[in-house]
């Protein structure tokens, strides 16, 4: 029986081969077609970057962004593949650019006014098609931007000088509130409280608990940064989102109470002409049916968190740089004495504070806080010879560009880098074009007011061995010091105003 089974005469070999060959041929053809598809996909892009390799490339690049943070991942990829390269984020083709000519092209054209990020993540924090910062609906973004532009320029900018100077003086008079037992100053907390107080006085005008709101703002920012590029599956696992949900809710609930108080005051006021601020304008727009209630609340929230979130960290880095460079401090103090003297700072002083302005610019170049810009192409285009398809994500790596082009000593902190006029295409800390930072002018003026008011009263020092270069930092959506790992306090020594130039 066994021999019969093994005997080939019992089988029609020809028929067996004819059945097997088509199946094998189909399998080979399918495999060949698949490999050609993958090969063709990779060949369609002449832009440098990691390999697609059966979809593994996009998975790895997205994981790298989640693991390293957006800013650190951008620096890694630009260093690896050049100043114009391609990766994938959330499965979407994403360009990372640190070349000035390409950045200039993206920023100046209106078909790059949209940003990108996880829709579910932005919905989670309330920014999806609301507010201004990450509102990716061009029509809705255009509807709210004029409110921000009006509030951050003209009379609002002039009022800010006095309000900000008064806030700094008030907080410096209560410096013990942000000092530890050794008398060291928690500069980040101090700056965040000053920025929040100034923003509130300018844009909302409702008394609030600074210390509590500052903590809630930090929690909200952490959630925003953590969720911006998370894959959709993350939001289906409730326990992963719970911590962020609480942080977002804490700030939104606190803001809701403040905004409701604002609405009440508006509805009961006999006269509003002399006190129409940013929040009032938005609430009137809501009453006219131009904006939704949720959008109004988000706009006010974003206006109040912007300065405590970024400008406070910028000034923190500046004070560390001043402490390390006494010759810069001397030049600043000399200019303050010449331009301002012993009187209060005024709006007409701003153009005369050239050393202070150069110092601010060099600080933002050397140690940026916002060192990237995220955009999305709304139509097909060509950038520096590379084809860019509609829907492509783009990250402009400003921090890297500021150390690659034009500046004579790009890797050093020195005011020589701004001794001559810098063409604006080579230095863009706030961006430019239709989606430039709406607060770029008021931010510069506010930083001048902070530095002048603080430095005329105090000489600043870091703790031994502390400096910006050695500080542990997190470079994600923005670049912040790691507050869990470093001693970030400073020593404030009161100046003798009559002898401040002798130091």
Curated annotation (Swiss-Prot):
<keyword id="KW-0408">Iron</keyword>
<keyword id="KW-0472">Membrane</keyword>
<dbReference type="GO" id="GO:0070330">
    <property type="term" value="F:aromatase activity"/>
</dbReference>
<keyword id="KW-0560">Oxidoreductase</keyword>
<dbReference type="InterPro" id="IPR001128">
    <property type="entry name" value="Cyt_P450"/>
</dbReference>
<dbReference type="GO" id="GO:0006629">
    <property type="term" value="P:lipid metabolic process"/>
</dbReference>
<dbReference type="GO" id="GO:0005789">
    <property type="term" value="C:endoplasmic reticulum membrane"/>
</dbReference>
<dbReference type="InterPro" id="IPR050196">
    <property type="entry name" value="Cytochrome_P450_Monoox"/>
</dbReference>
<dbReference type="InterPro" id="IPR017972">
    <property type="entry name" value="Cyt_P450_CS"/>
</dbReference>
<dbReference type="GO" id="GO:0032355">
    <property type="term" value="P:response to estradiol"/>
</dbReference>
<feature type="binding site">
    <location>
        <position position="374"/>
    </location>
    <ligand>
        <name>substrate</name>
    </ligand>
</feature>
<dbReference type="Pfam" id="PF00067">
    <property type="entry name" value="p450"/>
</dbReference>
<dbReference type="InterPro" id="IPR036396">
    <property type="entry name" value="Cyt_P450_sf"/>
</dbReference>
<feature type="binding site" description="axial binding residue">
    <location>
        <position position="437"/>
    </location>
    <ligand>
        <name>heme</name>
    </ligand>
</feature>
<keyword id="KW-0503">Monooxygenase</keyword>
<dbReference type="GO" id="GO:0020037">
    <property type="term" value="F:heme binding"/>
</dbReference>
<keyword id="KW-0492">Microsome</keyword>
<dbReference type="GO" id="GO:0005506">
    <property type="term" value="F:iron ion binding"/>
</dbReference>
<feature type="transmembrane region" description="Helical">
    <location>
        <begin position="53"/>
        <end position="73"/>
    </location>
</feature>
<feature type="transmembrane region" description="Helical">
    <location>
        <begin position="19"/>
        <end position="39"/>
    </location>
</feature>
<comment type="function">
    <text>A cytochrome P450 monooxygenase that catalyzes the conversion of C19 androgens, androst-4-ene-3,17-dione (androstenedione) and testosterone to the C18 estrogens, estrone and estradiol, respectively. Catalyzes three successive oxidations of C19 androgens: two conventional oxidations at C19 yielding 19-hydroxy and 19-oxo/19-aldehyde derivatives, followed by a third oxidative aromatization step that involves C1-beta hydrogen abstraction combined with cleavage of the C10-C19 bond to yield a phenolic A ring and formic acid.</text>
</comment>
<comment type="pathway">
    <text>Steroid hormone biosynthesis.</text>
</comment>
<keyword id="KW-0443">Lipid metabolism</keyword>
<keyword id="KW-0812">Transmembrane</keyword>
<feature type="binding site">
    <location>
        <position position="309"/>
    </location>
    <ligand>
        <name>substrate</name>
    </ligand>
</feature>
<keyword id="KW-0349">Heme</keyword>
<keyword id="KW-1133">Transmembrane helix</keyword>
<dbReference type="GO" id="GO:0005783">
    <property type="term" value="C:endoplasmic reticulum"/>
</dbReference>
<keyword id="KW-0479">Metal-binding</keyword>
<dbReference type="GO" id="GO:0101021">
    <property type="term" value="F:estrogen 2-hydroxylase activity"/>
</dbReference>
<dbReference type="InterPro" id="IPR002401">
    <property type="entry name" value="Cyt_P450_E_grp-I"/>
</dbReference>
<keyword id="KW-0256">Endoplasmic reticulum</keyword>
<dbReference type="GO" id="GO:0008585">
    <property type="term" value="P:female gonad development"/>
</dbReference>
<protein>
    <recommendedName>
        <fullName>Aromatase</fullName>
        <ecNumber>1.14.14.14</ecNumber>
    </recommendedName>
</protein>
<comment type="similarity">
    <text>Belongs to the cytochrome P450 family.</text>
</comment>
